């Protein structure tokens, strides 16, 4: 998301979200949902995005989330284009990573990640590159899976090759 128009379509806690670097250099995040009838605004990640257009009725939003045009809505009683905008999510950029909060009342990045930033700082995150995304569907209760992931006592027995590579 380095250049103006770069955008990523993703999900945050099950909510479709578009991250977009505006022509003004500001990185913004919006739900990928039109305010009119909830049609999608972006269909894929990419480069060179200009304005965001709803794929259902053609409502057009600027890169800052303001509604610019709503076809055939000129005569709608009480409707004003200037009253409509996409709800902006709070975004924080750190070391090439992007953090977005759906809840406008969520604590600030600095509060949530207090202490972690200092521990990670020696790692040159800025030089790292995204390689791939893996997804595994596991037929189990998520709490059991997370507990297993966080608990390292089983590593020597179940993953003996990792014992030499990881300080569990």
Which residues are covered by each model-predicted region?
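Rieske [2Fe-2S] iron-sulfur-binding domain
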Residues: 2-104, 108-118
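C-terminal catalytic domain of Rieske-type non-heme iron oxygenases
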Residues: 92, 97-168
């Amino acid at each position: 998301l380095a250049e103006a128009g770069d955008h990523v379509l993703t999900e945050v806690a099950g909510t479709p979200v578009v991250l977009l670097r505006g022509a003004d250099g500001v990185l913004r995040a919006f739900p990928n949902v039109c305010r009119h009838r909830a049609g999608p605004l972006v269909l894929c990640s990419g480069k060179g995005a200009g304005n965001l257009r709803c794929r259902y009725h053609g409502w057009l939003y600027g890169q800052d989330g303001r509604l610019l045009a709503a076809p055939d809505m000129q005569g709608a009683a009480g409707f004003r284009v200037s009253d409509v905008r996409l709800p902006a999510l709070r975004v924080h950029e750190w070391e090439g990573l992007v953090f977005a909060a759906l809840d406008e009342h969520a604590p600030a990045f600095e509060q949530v990640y207090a202490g972690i930033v200092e521990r990670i700082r020696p790692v040159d995150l800025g030089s790292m590159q995204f390689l791939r995304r893996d997804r595994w569907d596991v037929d189990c209760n998520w709490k059991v899976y997370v507990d297993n992931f966080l608990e390292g006592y089983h590593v020597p027995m179940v993953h003996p090759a990792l014992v030499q590579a990881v300080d569990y």
